[in-house]
Regions:
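Repeated scaffold domains used in trafficking and secretory/extracellular systems
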Residues: 1, 58-65, 105-115, 151-161, ...
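Blade-loop segments of beta-propeller domains
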Residues: 24-70
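A short loop-to-beta-strand structural motif that recurs across blades of beta-propeller domains
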Residues: 28-31, 38-41, 87-89, 129-131, ...
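A short beta-strand motif characteristic of beta-propeller blades
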Residues: 48-56, 97-102, 139-149, 201-212
Length: 256
């Protein structure tokens, strides 16, 4: 999710047929591709839809986290399964016109633009691999092989480039609870990733949840400077959701 001025841009998927897991891998996949349509929405602070465009083609219909480079929105749309394929689009926020910039033989689930280097960075399914591309005109050129993410703490859902060759990523991980009762514990958090090294330099669990118990960082977010601190917008629910707004204050200010 990206905030430009007083409005927001949000990628979303409309699933018409969920994926089905195979009993054993087939052609390197653990599930079928399912079916659906990818969307990019433009809406205001009240949730009123202003514009919408479809994104993707065929079985490539699942958009991931998006970022803004000051001119273009960058959106990756992938098959809804790991180890698959993606199309990276650049979208003009003024006209909502999308142009293909690259195709990737992997599921790219989040993008972040580093303005200091003119580089686009991406994370794979589960955030296990980190990719780099140089923006060259209307196309992207891969920079080196994918790098392994040394952190297993979060599955990035959305990322954004910040100062000094770093990106801020939000996400969630699910852990099965032991014992006969079982159940799942979902942990949300934020990571500040050093883009030069391809590794997080700061990790912050986010303990705030929605009324129904969803981690605040389960889906897209946007954070920017606000006064002496930060302001964050979070949209954790699937389907119909609520845009949560939180002010993040320095520790001394939050205690006053």
């Amino acid at each position: 999710m990206v905030r430009i001025g007083e409005t927001f841009y949000l990628s979303s998927v409309e699933v018409s047929r969920p994926t089905t897991r195979f009993s054993a891998p087939r052609n390197g996949f653990d599930r079928d591709p399912g079916a659906g349509v990818g969307h990019l929405f433009h809406f205001d602070g009240t949730g009123r839809l202003l514009r919408e465009i479809p994104l993707g083609e065929g079985t490539i219909y699942h958009p991931g986290g998006i970022d803004f480079d000051g001119r273009w929105l960058w959106v990756a749309v992938a098959e809804y399964r790991p180890e698959s394929r993606s199309i990276i689009y650049r979208v003009d926020p003024e006209t909502m016109q999308a142009r293909e910039a690259a195709r990737v033989n992997d599921h790219v689930g989040a993008l972040a633009y580093d303005r200091s280097e003119g580089m686009l960075h991406g994370a794979s399914w589960g955030s296990r691999r980190l990719y780099r591309w140089k923006v060259r005109g209307e196309r992207l050129a891969a920079v080196g092989p994918a790098r392994r993410n040394p952190s297993f703490y979060l599955d990035y859902q959305d990322c954004h480039g910040v100062d000094r060759q770093r990106m801020l990523c939000g996400g969630v991980s699910s852990y099965r609870l032991p014992g006969a009762a079982g159940g799942v514990f979902r942990l949300g958090g934020l990571e500040l990733v050093d883009l030069a090294r391809g590794a997080p330099v700061h990790q912050l669990p986010v303990e705030v949840s929605t009324p129904e118990g969803l981690p605040l960082t389960q889906n897209p977010f946007w954070i920017e400077r606000h006064g002496d601190g930060l302001r964050g917008w979070f949209l954790p629910q699937d389907g119909r959701g609520t845009l949560f707004v939180y002010d993040i204050l320095p520790r001394s200010a939050s205690r006053s």
